[in-house]
């Protein structure tokens, strides 16, 4: 009996702390093999499959049928859309697509249930250690031009051991907001904040620069006393100008790119062209009225890599609204304050301009940080 209680306590306290390490280091190993052996390992995928089964059986054991009903509803909408197309329904690629979209809702709800019975601190602490470890590698990569740690092969950017630019982008956006909400006065916190901000700039993605600019504006408007708001706004303009200058210093060819391809294509990194050449023709040639409500996709090549448009392509208008509602309720538990409203709005803006947020099964583990810091913040306000 005592042994059983100890196992349960360990599970609730450390399960998600272990998952962060497994997700991070499995992708790190995969990036190493991809770079040095031109071979992508299935290790990250296999780990995620095992975790899905563990969490699935946990939900069944806890008799949490509401989560399953939500997933089945979204799956049903997807199937309706697919049946309206003249393509095979039971296609491995299509199953993978909908599975990736369902995973965040499944994972966030599972995390919420487990953390209700466990401690958050080990999870937060491991997250901070990953920030420090990856940031040190990232800065070393920047200083010594270590190609393994690069974000892109063709332009500036270093992301440490993250395998994709999307994962590193959202990881550092979440890390910045996590530290903004934590806001402790200690040498460790100052070090963690400094190394996170420096690393965020070195990652070199437009989404991180955009988030930093939005955060600076938010602080200037809502966190600074009215008497000092004008000074704060001037300071914000200066900082934003510095960030913009840094971006163009690191990417000197970007201005030429804007002149050649246009501002929209530069901001969206060719995603507007993908939409016009792949997504829109597919919709025009294959969709019926039903598909506008429940979506319909043939393969990943139809995607524009614009988050909200790809969601609409997969689940249609009704499916997208239902999905976003379920996603929001999975992430935000309780009364939302202006800080978290800022994060949600910023996230929507960034997702609208970029891709792979909903489609990445790795980003969701770091979203659990946002979910739990939100709950912790609510508990401190109410308690």
Residue ranges of model-derived segments:
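Hydrophobic transmembrane helix bundles of membrane-integrated enzymes that assemble
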Residues: 1-257, 302-383
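Long extracytoplasmic/lumenal interhelical loops at the membrane interface
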Residues: 34, 148, 254-315
């Amino acid at each position: 009996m005592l042994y059983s209680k100890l196992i349960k306590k360990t599970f609730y306290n450390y399960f998600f702390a272990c998952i962060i390490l497994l997700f991070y280091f499995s992708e790190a190993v995969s990036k190493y093999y991809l770079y040095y052996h031109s071979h992508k390992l299935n290790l990250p995928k296999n780990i995620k499959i095992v975790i899905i089964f563990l969490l699935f059986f946990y939900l069944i054991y806890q008799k949490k049928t509401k989560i399953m009903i939500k997933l089945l509803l979204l799956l049903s909408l997807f199937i309706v859309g697919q049946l309206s197309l003249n393509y095979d329904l039971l296609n491995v690629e299509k199953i993978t697509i909908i599975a990736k979209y369902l995973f965040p809702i499944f994972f966030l709800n599972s995390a919420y249930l487990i953390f209700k019975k466990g401690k958050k601190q080990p999870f937060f602490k491991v997250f901070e250690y990953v920030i420090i470890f990856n940031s040190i590698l990232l800065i070393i990569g920047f200083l010594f031009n270590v190609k393994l740690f690069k974000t892109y092969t063709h332009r500036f950017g270093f992301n440490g051991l993250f395998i994709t630019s999307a994962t590193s982008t959202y990881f550092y956006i979440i890390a910045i907001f996590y530290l903004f909400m934590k806001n402790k006065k200690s040498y460790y916190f100052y070090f963690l904040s400094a190394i996170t901000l420096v690393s965020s700039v070195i990652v070199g993605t437009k989404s991180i620069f955009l988030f930093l600019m939005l955060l600076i504006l938010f602080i200037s408007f809502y966190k600074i006393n009215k008497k000092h708001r004008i000074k704060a706004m001037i300071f914000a303009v200066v900082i934003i100008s510095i960030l913009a200058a840094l971006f163009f210093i690191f990417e000197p060819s970007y201005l030429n790119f804007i002149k050649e391809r246009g501002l929209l294509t530069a901001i969206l990194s060719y995603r507007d062209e993908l939409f016009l050449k792949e997504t829109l023709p597919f919709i025009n040639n294959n969709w019926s009225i039903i598909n506008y409500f429940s979506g319909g996709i043939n393969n990943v090549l139809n995607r524009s890599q614009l988050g909200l448009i790809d969601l609409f392509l997969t689940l249609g208008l009704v499916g997208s609204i239902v999905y976003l509602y379920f996603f929001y309720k999975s992430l935000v538990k309780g009364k939302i304050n202006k800080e978290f409203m800022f994060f949600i709005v910023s996230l929507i803006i960034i997702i609208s301009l970029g891709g792979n947020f909903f489609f990445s099964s790795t980003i969701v583990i770091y979203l659990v940080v946002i979910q739990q810091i939100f709950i912790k913040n609510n508990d401190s306000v109410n308690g």
